[in-house]
From Swiss-Prot:
One of its GO terms (biological process) is regulation of cell shape. It comes from Pseudomonas putida (strain W619). This is Biosynthetic peptidoglycan transglycosylase. PANTHER family: BIOSYNTHETIC PEPTIDOGLYCAN TRANSGLYCOSYLASE, MONOFUNCTIONAL BIOSYNTHETIC PEPTIDOGLYCAN TRANSGLYCOSYLASE. The gene is mtgA. It catalyses: [GlcNAc-(1->4)-Mur2Ac(oyl-L-Ala-gamma-D-Glu-L-Lys-D-Ala-D-Ala)](n)-di-trans,octa-cis-undecaprenyl diphosphate + beta-D-GlcNAc-(1->4)-Mur2Ac(oyl-L-Ala-gamma-D-Glu-L-Lys-D-Ala-D-Ala)-di-trans,octa-cis-undecaprenyl diphosphate = [GlcNAc-(1->4)-Mur2Ac(oyl-L-Ala-gamma-D-Glu-L-Lys-D-Ala-D-Ala)](n+1)-di-trans,octa-cis-undecaprenyl diphosphate + di-trans,octa-cis-undecaprenyl diphosphate + H(+).
Length: 236
């Protein structure tokens, strides 16, 4: 009986691995029609009885402001061009900080955030973290850095029911994502850690301060020219 259970488990793991690989490969070229986070928000609205209108309009790489691309990297993952999905020093620093009793501090890279938002549910269980690591590795293996950032920018949450750069630009500033200024891009990047609580168009003192820090980091990275580095390390 035990051997039968083990065989069934092995088959289940095989088909899960095969299915997830196929899914990641498909999304290498095909825009994801939605995300797990969007489904989660919709379910939460049904449970609470508060209707939510999900806004999302996929935009290709060239239709998104370069300033927003750099601002997101500056604010969320400055080692994005160099790592393979995991920022080990940042993870170690976050673990040490949390062990000292501070507020829970994360160290997720942009790739990890894409894996979580696209495929998984919210939470901090070891199962979810393990699946996040699996999908992160697959994404880094099969996608370019440009594709990872493109999917992130089209999937990130920027307000209640607001997903992706185009919906965010229209919701907060009434313009297309391609026309975002450096300041507007920094404000959008500044609210990513808490997009429901914070507003990019009506920034609190903290958000304004964080946006200023992000602008300085954008300059240190080299501005839009930094984007040329994204896949340089992967070229033969």
């Amino acid at each position: 009986m035990l051997s039968s259970l083990l065989r069934r488990l092995a088959r289940a793991l095989f088909w899960f691995a095969a299915g997830s690989i196929v899914l990641v490969l498909v999304f290498r070229w095909v825009p994801p029609p939605g995300t797990a986070l969007m489904v989660e928000r919709k379910v939460q609205s049904w449970v609470s009885g508060e209707p939510i209108d999900l806004q999302r309009d996929w935009q290709p790489w060239e239709s998104i402001s370069d300033d927003l691309k750099v601002a997101v990297i500056a604010g969320e993952d400055q080692k994005f061009a160099n790592h393979w999905g995991f920022d080990i020093p940042a993870i170690q620093a976050a673990l040490a900080y949390n062990e000292r009793g501070g507020n829970i501090r994360g160290a997720s890279t942009l790739t990890q955030q894409v894996a979580k938002n696209l495929f998984l549910w919210s939470g901090r269980s070891w199962l979810r973290k393990g699946l996040e690591a699996w999908f992160t590795a697959l994404i880094e293996l099969f996608w370019s850095k440009e594709r990872i950032l493109e999917v992130y920018l089209n999937s990130a949450e920027w307000g209640k029911g607001v997903f992706g750069a185009q919906a965010a630009a229209r919701y907060h500033f009434g313009i297309d994502a391609s026309r975002l200024s450096r300041q507007q891009a920094a404000q959008l990047a500044a609210v990513l850690p808490s997009p429901i609580k914070w507003s990019a168009s009506r920034p609190s003192a903290y958000v304004a301060s964080r946006a200023g820090w992000i602008r300085r980091q954008m300059s240190q990275l080299g501005g839009p020219s930094y984007l040329m580095q994204l896949d340089a390390s992967r070229r033969p």
